Amino acid sequence: MGSLTFRDVAIQFSLEEWQCLDTAQQNLYRNVMLENYRNLVFLGIAAPKPDLIIFLEQGKEPWNMKRHELVKEPPVICSHFAQDLWPEQGREDSFQKVILRRYEKCGHENLQLKIGCTNVDECKVHKKGYNKLNQSLTTTQSKVFQCGKYANIFHKCSNSKRHKIRHTGKKLLKCKEYVRSFCMLSHLSQHKRIYTRENSYKSEEHGKAFNWSSALTYKRIHTGEKPCKCEECGKAFSKFSILTKHKVIHTGEKHYKCEECGKAFTRSSSLIEHKRSHAGEKPYKCEECGKAFSKASTLTAHKTIHAGEKPYKCEECGKAFNRSSNLMEHKRIHTGEKPCKCEECGKAFGNFSTLTKHKVIHTGEKPYKCEECGKAFSWPSSLTEHKRIHAGDKPYKCEECGKTFKWSSTLTKHKIIHTGEKPYKCEECGKAFTTFSSLTKHKVIHTGEKHYKCEECGKVFSWSSSLTTHKAIHAGEKLYKCEECGKAFKWSSNLMEHKRIHTGEKPYKCEECGKAFSKVANLTKHKVIHTGEKQYKCEECGKAFIWSSRLSEHKRIHTGEKPYKCEECGKAFSWVSVLNKHKKIHAGKKFYKCEECGKDFNQSSHLTTHKRIHTGGKTLQM
């Protein structure tokens, strides 16, 4: 089989055919022809640039291009008309076409030889063809057929009929190989040339066979060549069609509009995908787990979960991801970039999904409701996590110690206890943290910002978690119950800490003195004893404290604030510990017993005072 040439993939239009096309079709023709030529050049097939391509690049009309001008091949020259002809065509047919094309707008009486040849013998190249043409014209002058639409003259009835078919738009010729129809035999022949060459190109990399356009695309995957460059931003592409799609980004044009919701898209494929959200259609199904998706790209991304593949690696810290979008979002942690800004409050975020979640704070919307207890949530993920409280599920297990967790985020945080790693450092004071969220919370200490306000009492907090914790005081809810002793807690973390009283577990150990604690907060507080650091200072009197909680309690001395009220008698206290002691008076309970005489007391301070009786007024040395 001969090699592919530009003539095999080029399509010729006459003036009347060209005028039947609308502007969009003409532009499509230009783009297709130019891309076909570029593809042939890339494959090393194309000869010197054909005149048709030069015309198209210059924006000229291609209809007046002669068929033989499509490629540069050695022509046969007619000495009389100096007309280039196809060598492979019959000269007889060629000469007739030359005469008819030259005089197509004249009457049939003008179809004769002009100056230059005294007789037929002098036109040696086309002698036979001329004789036949002359005979045809002289013997059948009454059978010259005229096209009423464009006044073209045809010397055969078949030619006239064939020409008229162009105006009717009928496509009588059908390709058996593909379901396509054509109105002209030449167009059908043209089409056949393309499909007969299918699989004639083989990839040297894998020996895979392709048709000519697929071969080009496949070849570019291996070479990495991207010849189609965007003049606007310099981005390069392997195919001209992809470049055309890309250009829409710069223009911002959105021609494809959803009739259902009015949303517009730059590409028709995006609109088709979008429509599935209204229809609920999910045609792309995962063979592994049966989960269905509305987009093929989402299915492809999903499949990496089963494969365990993580091809996208962060050059900064080495962390790997199964999606490029996740890597891009992760990189913002290192760069500090926050491109997604909330129009309501100006707060910026590293990714769009976090911004979307944040926006719910302003609307107060909670569309996701728990069927078990009726509690509502702003996000579906929060509802899913909440449901585990009722189910008691703990699907996430630590391979190091075997401990199980309800949430993957809690397991991730837990793992750092074993490694002792603290990758997140505060630029302000140099303090390091195990999680990014802990660093974010810490930074508020330096800024003093308090964005989260309680609608019930007006109190403001630096962190949303603190506000959530605070709200439980007003609600009086205690959802988390200890199965061992029945004691209930407002927060799951408090229940977990409480359980350690029964188990005696003390997982948090001080590296300095070896003392162990059941709570990480207690270990943190304890460590300050070794450093002697008192970083929390009272602005009123200058007194310094090791812990921020002590400073907060101390400030009440100056303000006179007593937020802790006894429900029994109405008496108020500055500190919760004092309120707890006070409540024992009403309960009549006496937890503190003197080992010397057996007397009971409801407060430890009363027992300490009592003991002085036995010691003779001397305070016991502990």
Swiss-Prot record:
<feature type="zinc finger region" description="C2H2-type 10">
    <location>
        <begin position="480"/>
        <end position="502"/>
    </location>
</feature>
<dbReference type="InterPro" id="IPR050329">
    <property type="entry name" value="GLI_C2H2-zinc-finger"/>
</dbReference>
<dbReference type="Pfam" id="PF00096">
    <property type="entry name" value="zf-C2H2"/>
</dbReference>
<keyword id="KW-0862">Zinc</keyword>
<dbReference type="GO" id="GO:0045944">
    <property type="term" value="P:positive regulation of transcription by RNA polymerase II"/>
</dbReference>
<dbReference type="Pfam" id="PF13465">
    <property type="entry name" value="zf-H2C2_2"/>
</dbReference>
<dbReference type="GO" id="GO:0008270">
    <property type="term" value="F:zinc ion binding"/>
</dbReference>
<feature type="zinc finger region" description="C2H2-type 9">
    <location>
        <begin position="452"/>
        <end position="474"/>
    </location>
</feature>
<dbReference type="InterPro" id="IPR036236">
    <property type="entry name" value="Znf_C2H2_sf"/>
</dbReference>
<feature type="domain" description="KRAB">
    <location>
        <begin position="4"/>
        <end position="75"/>
    </location>
</feature>
<feature type="zinc finger region" description="C2H2-type 4">
    <location>
        <begin position="312"/>
        <end position="334"/>
    </location>
</feature>
<dbReference type="GO" id="GO:0006357">
    <property type="term" value="P:regulation of transcription by RNA polymerase II"/>
</dbReference>
<protein>
    <recommendedName>
        <fullName>Zinc finger protein 728</fullName>
    </recommendedName>
</protein>
<dbReference type="InterPro" id="IPR013087">
    <property type="entry name" value="Znf_C2H2_type"/>
</dbReference>
<keyword id="KW-0677">Repeat</keyword>
<dbReference type="GO" id="GO:0005634">
    <property type="term" value="C:nucleus"/>
</dbReference>
<feature type="zinc finger region" description="C2H2-type 7">
    <location>
        <begin position="396"/>
        <end position="418"/>
    </location>
</feature>
<feature type="zinc finger region" description="C2H2-type 3">
    <location>
        <begin position="284"/>
        <end position="306"/>
    </location>
</feature>
<dbReference type="InterPro" id="IPR036051">
    <property type="entry name" value="KRAB_dom_sf"/>
</dbReference>
<dbReference type="InterPro" id="IPR001909">
    <property type="entry name" value="KRAB"/>
</dbReference>
<feature type="zinc finger region" description="C2H2-type 2">
    <location>
        <begin position="256"/>
        <end position="278"/>
    </location>
</feature>
<dbReference type="Pfam" id="PF01352">
    <property type="entry name" value="KRAB"/>
</dbReference>
<feature type="zinc finger region" description="C2H2-type 11">
    <location>
        <begin position="508"/>
        <end position="530"/>
    </location>
</feature>
<keyword id="KW-0863">Zinc-finger</keyword>
<feature type="zinc finger region" description="C2H2-type 13">
    <location>
        <begin position="564"/>
        <end position="586"/>
    </location>
</feature>
<feature type="zinc finger region" description="C2H2-type 1">
    <location>
        <begin position="228"/>
        <end position="250"/>
    </location>
</feature>
<feature type="zinc finger region" description="C2H2-type 12">
    <location>
        <begin position="536"/>
        <end position="558"/>
    </location>
</feature>
<feature type="zinc finger region" description="C2H2-type 8">
    <location>
        <begin position="424"/>
        <end position="446"/>
    </location>
</feature>
<dbReference type="GO" id="GO:0000978">
    <property type="term" value="F:RNA polymerase II cis-regulatory region sequence-specific DNA binding"/>
</dbReference>
<keyword id="KW-0479">Metal-binding</keyword>
<feature type="zinc finger region" description="C2H2-type 6">
    <location>
        <begin position="368"/>
        <end position="390"/>
    </location>
</feature>
<feature type="zinc finger region" description="C2H2-type 5">
    <location>
        <begin position="340"/>
        <end position="362"/>
    </location>
</feature>
<dbReference type="GO" id="GO:0000981">
    <property type="term" value="F:DNA-binding transcription factor activity, RNA polymerase II-specific"/>
</dbReference>
<feature type="zinc finger region" description="C2H2-type 14">
    <location>
        <begin position="592"/>
        <end position="614"/>
    </location>
</feature>
